[in-house]
C-alpha cells in the first residue's frame, strides 16, 4: 500500500 507517488512517475 503506497500512499505516496513512486520515484519513477512522469511529471
UniProtKB/Swiss-Prot annotation:
Disulphide bridges: none
Keywords of the record: Hypotensive agent, Metalloenzyme inhibitor, Metalloprotease inhibitor, Protease inhibitor, Pyrrolidone carboxylic acid, Secreted, Toxin
GO biological-process terms attached to the record: regulation of blood pressure
Record GO terms (molecular function): peptidase inhibitor activity; toxin activity
UniProt-annotated location(s): Secreted
Organism domain of life: Eukaryota
Main location: secreted
GO cellular component entries: extracellular region
Function field: This peptide evokes slight hypotension (-2 mmHg), when injected alone into rats. It has a bradykinin-potentiating effect (75%), when 60 nmol of BPP-11f are coinjected with 0.5 ug of bradykinin into rats. It inhibits angiotensin converting enzyme (ACE) activity with a K(i)app of 82.10 uM.
Similarity comment text for this entry: Belongs to the bradykinin-potentiating peptide family.
Name the record gives this protein: Bradykinin-potentiating peptide 11f
Organism field: Bothrops cotiara
